[in-house]
Design a protein with these regions (language model features):
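Bacterial N-terminal signal peptides that target proteins for export
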Residues: 16-27
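Bacterial N-terminal signal peptides
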Residues: 26-34
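N-terminal, active-site-proximal structural segment of metallo-dependent hydrolase catalytic domains
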Residues: 37-129, 139-143, 149
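Active-site regions of metal-assisted phosphoester/phosphodiester hydrolases
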Residues: 40-83, 156-217
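Short, surface-exposed basic-aromatic patches at helix termini and helix-loop junctions that form
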Residues: 126-133, 155-157
């Protein structure tokens, strides 16, 4: 599932909500329901297009010895996650992002991503697909998540650049949790303004509803 927002650089414009149709990948039975928030102002250059997408177990096809999920999503693992299937997913992801660009008349300026194995899979996504035509760069840090998946940003260097980047370690009852970090970046926009972006994605009921209740409140 992915979400898309147009972020206005004006505070007093009307916001409209609407749902876009489902998309289906040829290779994977994903229902990619896109929700959009679009604001209109005098020029299309007065807003940025911001997107979030949970890529759901975006692992490469090799077993790097980094845990059970890494073995599961490998050529020899239980998912039989081969090189061919990995690059097919890269192509499907790129086509969906390109669809957003066709629809809105510009490519997403910043994309928040969830369930990413490492920076390497994002590098392969950008270099092996049509996304290589665009000036995307990567912000990613490995977290302490038990399954080895993280959050990340892709951003267009012609539109913004990170002034600061930090990770926030989730805590509960004074103890750091072995889960995905919260990623925060303060971005300098090409028009001179600054916008802070935060992306996070956490297990909702890890360990069961009763076990996780305190951490969710």
């Amino acid at each position: 599932m992915f979400y898309c927002w147009n972020i206005l650089q004006s505070d007093n414009k009307r916001i409209e909500n609407y749902m876009k149709p489902n998309l289906r990948s040829i290779f994977f039975i994903w229902m990619l329901v896109a929700f959009s928030v679009e604001g209109y102002c005098g020029s299309r250059e007065e807003y940025m297009l911001i997107m979030f997408w949970n890529l759901e177990n975006f692992f490469d096809y090799t077993d790097g010895g980094e845990g059970e999920s890494d073995r599961e999503f490998s050529s020899s693992g239980s998912r039989h996650w081969t090189k061919k299937r990995f690059y097919a997913k890269c192509d499907a992801v790129a086509k969906s992002i390109m669809w957003m660009g066709d629809h809105y008349g510009r490519m997403p300026d910043l994309i928040g991503l969830a369930e990413i194995e490492n920076k390497g899979v994002l590098y392969k996504l950008l270099k092996s697909t049509a996304l290589r035509k665009y000036d995307y760069d990567i912000i990613h840090y490995d977290s302490g998540d038990r399954r080895g998946i993280d959050v990340a940003f892709l951003y267009r260097k012609s539109v913004m650049h990170p002034e600061t980047v930090s990770v926030i370690k989730p805590e509960y009852d004074g103890q750091k949790l072995s889960t995905r970090d919260i990623l925060h970046s303060s971005m300098q926009i090409s028009d001179g303004s600054r916008i802070d972006f935060i992306v996070n994605h956490h297990p909702s009921k890890f360990g069961g509803e009763d076990e996780s209740k305190g951490r969710r409140n």
